[in-house]
Amino acid sequence: MKLSKKFVVGLAATAIVGSIGITAASAATIVAGGATFPLNLMESCRATFAGDTTANAAGDKIDYTGVGSGTGRANFFKNDYKFAMSDSLWKTSEITTAGSPRTASNFVFMPLIAGAINVAYNLEGVKPAGTVLQMSSATVAKIFAAQITKWNDPAILADNPVAAQPLLLGLNGQAKIALAKKSATKATLTATLTKKVVDNKTKNLIITSSVDGGKTVKKIYNKKPVAGKLTLSVPYAVGTIYSVTLDKALLGTVSVDATAITLPDTPITVYKRKDTSGTTNNFANYLNKTQPTIWNKVTNDAFDTAFPGTVPTDGSFVAAQGNDGVANGVMGKNGAIGYAEVSFVNERQLAGKTIASAKIKNGAGEFLAGSSKGASLAVGAAATDAATGIVTFNYENTVAGAYPITAVSYGMANTAAFDTTANNTIVKNYVNYVLDTCAPAVAELKGYAPLPTSLVTISKALAAKIGA
């Protein structure tokens, strides 16, 4: 897999310029931007759209910049962007700020893609090493409200009781590790990897066993992985923990015996968004709706505005630009935690970076890491306005497998009442290409969730209004 962004720097807003003039004889470029949540998908779709002679015979291009949902909407309303993406809803005040002739009736707002918001963290000193931490909504809310400041807080420990962990799902469901006791001295370990993991130039699948609290560690498998299911008969003794690594990326551990987890007293550093962010809006809404006594403010694109109180200024909260910036910050700081769309975490894990996704407790009582499948189930359990396509999540739905912190990203485009140029034709072609071709083909590979058929139908009806 070719990584969509370099990790050294986060996203930066580029200078905003108008659309290149369109002529019948030449391709045109549509200047667009907005949410960073769908950025990895947008990069893939706009690249293939440019070369798709069926959907885009003229070879037109979409120049999309991830600047955050709030800035994206503002630039769209000012007509600096001909197309924008936003993970949060627009406000009438934003239209008023943009001024005439912008009105609520001369643009289209339609759902294009969904995805999971992962709670990403980086923590050394967890025992057993490689354990993927679990968190309830109350624990997540307290951490991001600065009410929990150390990793060995009793609330985090309570979410991670002594228990067996015979199943490990990682990399957006691309890796599945299962363990079953076979006899007093043997166990069966199965590793199921998708072609995506293998095609990522992964050199080695490494499995180690440890007993006596990690005092005795043995490498029991170290070979190039293959796509499909690998079944191994592995040595077993009571208390054995098996760690699974792809090159340098530790996926986690499995065990058939109840194992106590030990956490270090490392201070927690929270990475939040610097920009006005739809990811923040959805994340804060989840906290407010599930834990209103802890996170007692209504949601907002600005983290500091949604924060229940005053954000600490002692360095325990760090602002970062975009989903990329948050993921970069978390992977670079021991004790860090943040929130980002699942693809930004997975691509770093595949590159061997130190970052993990906490398993979040859903309404069915399951602890799950964010995934395309979990997000799809959450969208399916949400309420959708058939006229507008706006999705309202029930964060405590009891659907098995539904990941609770899920968001939808919406496209924004003009009607003929605002813009009568051929820009609209290009934007409409691109939106339909995303819905019909690109998202169904690559969304899950990139870490997103394609919209259900019923929602695509609504989006297509809305897209028909672009330029009309």
Question: Model-predicted segments: where are they?
Answer:
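C-terminal segment of classical bacterial N-terminal signal peptides
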Residues: 17-25
